[in-house]
Amino acid sequence: MDPRKVNELRAFVKMCKKDPSILHTQEMRFLREWVESMGGTATQKAKSEENTKEEKPDSKVEEDLKADEPSSEESDLEIDKEGVIEPDTDAPQEMGDENAEITEEVMDQANDKKVAAIEALNDGELQKAIDLFTDAIKLNPRLAILYAKRASVFVKLQKPNAAIRDCDRAIEINPDSAQPYKRRGKAHRLLGHWEEAAHDLALACKFDYDEDASAMLKEVQPRAQKIAEHQRKYERKREE
């Protein structure tokens, strides 16, 4: 047999091994029938594997899209976002050294800084107030009210994330004080975190009723309830 034809046949067989689906084309029907008449089988395994490989990314993309794409049940929730702002991204503020030694003299110095900070706040000098409250915190980092006061200034500066950090610290020191919950509730409201805002403002009113906190609670609570009800409805749909 012509060696050239043998080489061509060898190349063709190699190609068929790589992609047996070639044997399933109409023009190769005669060869497929001959293979089967000899007791062999001409499967499409390689082709199907190739198709699977080609289809898998599409399937994966489709699954990802389905996961990322909110269902009609999720996307039909409309909440009034009036007053919601973009989150602040400043580096975390100084929190002081909680292991610092605090003498009576240091406490007096911290109190002087606090008084000066409140005066600056009353004069509308917000950044000066922040700086003075920070000085007070560095002197007495275990006094919850200092963090709550500084948080109130951060809220005025529309820096809710900074306010939340201060409130978290204040609550860690004294979890029974109303002020940190009130400030944190206001900060969450600025970010559109309705459920968190409602939770904190409700606690603030529970610890020490405040008309301002109560008024804001009445504003955010319907939105928080709407979200909670929507989530329950969505979960029931998924369980079905």
Curated annotation (Swiss-Prot):
TPR repeats: 110-143, 145-177, 179-211
Ranges of compositional bias, category Basic and acidic residues: 46-69, 226-240
Chief place of localization: cytoplasm
A single cellular component GO annotation: extracellular exosome
UniProt KW Cytoplasm keyword: yes
Residue stretches of biased makeup (Acidic residues): 85-94
Location of the region described as Disordered in the Swiss-Prot/TrEMBL record: 38-94, 220-240
Record's keyword terms, sorted: Cytoplasm, Repeat, TPR repeat
Compartmental location: Cytoplasm
PANTHER family in alphabetical order: HSC70-INTERACTING PROTEIN, PROTEIN FAM10A4-RELATED
This protein's name: Putative protein FAM10A4
Source organism: Homo sapiens (Human)
